[in-house]
Amino acid sequence: MSTNEIKNDYSAKEETAGPGDSNTSEIKTSDVYKVDKNLPSRFNNPDCFRYSHKTTNPLYRTTNQAYGSKKPTVHEMPTSFNGSRHRFSEHLLKSGMYRDNGFNTMLDKSRLSRPNETSVFYDRINFHSLYHTAGKS
């Protein structure tokens, strides 16, 4: 069976099954392709992804919105899954993320205000140091 025949067969099943038919059998990736034994069920069953269709003005509809609004078919689903080890983040799952609860007592250094001047922010004329190049503001 060629790929075109598989696609035509699948699209014919899609057309005959109505949205309200609850007795229709969902086609799985393993029915069409050879899949790995450790493939997660969400990849074997593309109908588990629930898509809602929001009506938008066609004038403002982008190509990403048009492509993303379509449900995935078995032909777009992966047939193998190679999960990574979680050795890097296992200790974070047990103890939680690091959080610094320290109290900052250092003065903030800024070009706009000098450390010994606290009322500079409230003075609209002497606010910026570039206005006064000759001397101290």
Curated annotation (Swiss-Prot):
Compartments where found: Cytoplasm, Cytoskeleton, Cilium axoneme
Primary location: cytoplasm
Keyword Cytoplasm attributed: yes
Keywords per UniProt: Cell projection, Cytoplasm, Cytoskeleton
Segments for region (Disordered): 1-29, 62-83
One GO term (biological process): determination of left/right symmetry
Highest taxon of the lineage: Eukaryota
UniProt keyword annotation of Nucleotide-binding present: no
InterPro entries in the cross-refs: PIRC1/2
Function: Microtubule inner protein involved in the attachment of outer dynein arms (ODAs) to dynein-decorated doublet microtubules (DMTs) in cilia axoneme, which is required for motile cilia beating. Functions at the initial step of left-right asymmetry specification of the visceral organs.
Protein name: Piercer of microtubule wall 2 protein
Species in which this protein is naturally found: Danio rerio (Zebrafish)
Gene name in the database record: pierce1
